């Protein structure tokens, strides 16, 4: 029986989710269609309702609607609640369920490159993207997790929710880290957060949550120029999609060849 899925966001034309899920479908021999829905700021909640009334099986949610999707759901997973945002929706017993697969997607992609246990980790940015990855990073038992933001107060808001983290302003960063994660939106507008020289001098592994299929993101290019190994978030996109696919279809697809295929476009 044909299953129906979609991703909703605004903008949405650039989304790779339909391509990724169709490759998962071929691999697992599940018949599905996966569409793009341009989100309407005024009618977003109605769009969600209509999708499931019309026999939709699962819906991914991307910017800028993850918080609204979270608020709309009746039942949320623990990781969704801690993230305060939802990217995966489905109906069960006539109730809207929500999950957030971004964090687990990041951890699975990072595991290709380094072990997180006992590492010193720096997150740049204190917005929704940062909040969504703190809990899974803490579960990996790092030695230290610091959230740095241009305005310290916003980072302190996250610290109140996650007391295990430390916070700093960008200017206060002087120590070395094993891993730096860019969770700011700077790369989306080709801007770079210039870090103190000491922070990059020990050549940390650098990871940008943003991705650019055609070229390197500004953060990846900047940190590579500083001599660091750096990757963008395309792998995270594929891994979070795999987790959503598993939630909906109870089958976990393989991701490595799909990621290689997307990198070779």
UniProtKB/Swiss-Prot annotation:
E.C. number: 1.1.1.25
Q: Which SUPFAM superfamilies match?
A: Aminoacid dehydrogenase-like, N-terminal domain, NAD(P)-binding Rossmann-fold domains
Q: What GO MF annotations does this protein's record show?
A: NADP binding; shikimate 3-dehydrogenase (NADP+) activity
Among Gene3D superfamilies, the record links this protein to: Leucine Dehydrogenase, chain A, domain 1 (3.40.50.10860), NAD(P)-binding Rossmann-like Domain (3.40.50.720)
**What positions does the entry give for NADP(+) binding?**
125-129, 149-154, 209, 233
Q: Which amino acid positions bind shikimate, per UniProt? A: 15-17, 62, 87, 102, 211
Keyword line? Amino-acid biosynthesis, Aromatic amino acid biosynthesis, NADP, Oxidoreductase
Spell out the catalytic residues. 66 (proton acceptor)
Region forming the signal peptide? none
Q: Which GO terms describe its biological process?
A: amino acid biosynthetic process; aromatic amino acid family biosynthetic process; chorismate biosynthetic process; shikimate metabolic process
Query: Does Lipid biosynthesis show up as a keyword for this record?
Result: no
**Its annotated pathway?**
Metabolic intermediate biosynthesis; chorismate biosynthesis; chorismate from D-erythrose 4-phosphate and phosphoenolpyruvate: step 4/7
List the catalysed reactions.
Answer: shikimate + NADP(+) = 3-dehydroshikimate + NADPH + H(+)
Reading the lineage from the top rank, the first entry is Bacteria
Q: Would you name any one GO CC term? A: cytosol
Query: Which cysteines bridge via disulfide bonds?
Result: none
Q: What class of enzyme is it?
A: oxidoreductase
Question: What is the role of the protein in this entry?
Answer: Involved in the biosynthesis of the chorismate, which leads to the biosynthesis of aromatic amino acids. Catalyzes the reversible NADPH linked reduction of 3-dehydroshikimate (DHSA) to yield shikimate (SA).
Q: Hey, which family's this protein in?
A: Belongs to the shikimate dehydrogenase family.
Subunit-level organization: Homodimer.
Which PANTHER family does this entry report, sorted A to Z?
A: BIFUNCTIONAL 3-DEHYDROQUINATE DEHYDRATASE_SHIKIMATE DEHYDROGENASE, CHLOROPLASTIC, SHIKIMATE DEHYDROGENASE
Q: What is this protein called?
A: Shikimate dehydrogenase (NADP(+))
Instruction: Give the lineage.
Output: Bacteria, Pseudomonadati, Pseudomonadota, Gammaproteobacteria, Legionellales
């Amino acid at each position: 029986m044909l299953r129906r899925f979609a991703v909703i966001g605004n903008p949405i034309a650039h989304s790779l989710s339909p391509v990724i899920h169709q490759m998962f479908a071929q691999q697992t021999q599940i018949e599905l269609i996966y569409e793009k829905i341009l989100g309407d700021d005024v009618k977003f909640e109605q769009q969600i309702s209509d999708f499931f009334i019309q026999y939709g099986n699962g819906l991914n949610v991307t910017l800028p609607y993850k918080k609204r999707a979270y608020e709309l759901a009746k039942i949320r997973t623990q990781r969704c609640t801690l993230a305060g945002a939802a990217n995966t929706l489905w109906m069960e017993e006539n109730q809207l369920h929500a999950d957030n697969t971004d964090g687990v997607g990041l951890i699975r992609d990072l595991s290709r490159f380094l072990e997180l246990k006992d590492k010193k980790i720096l997150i740049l940015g204190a917005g929704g993207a940062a909040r969504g990855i703190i809990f899974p990073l803490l579960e990996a038992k790092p030695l230290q997790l610091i959230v740095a933001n241009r305005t310290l107060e916003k980072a302190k808001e996250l610290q109140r929710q996650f007391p295990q983290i430390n916070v700093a302003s960008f200017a206060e960063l002087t120590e070395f880290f094993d891993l730096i994660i860019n969770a700011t939106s700077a790369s989306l507008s080709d801007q770079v957060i210039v870090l103190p020289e000491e922070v990059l001098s020990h050549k940390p592994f650098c990871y940008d949550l943003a991705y650019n299929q055609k070229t390197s993101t500004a953060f990846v290019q900047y940190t590579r120029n500083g001599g660091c190994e750096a990757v963008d978030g395309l792998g995270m996109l594929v891994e979070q999609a795999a987790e959503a696919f598993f939630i909906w279809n109870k089958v976990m697809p393989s991701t490595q060849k799909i990621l290689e295929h997307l990198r070779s476009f």
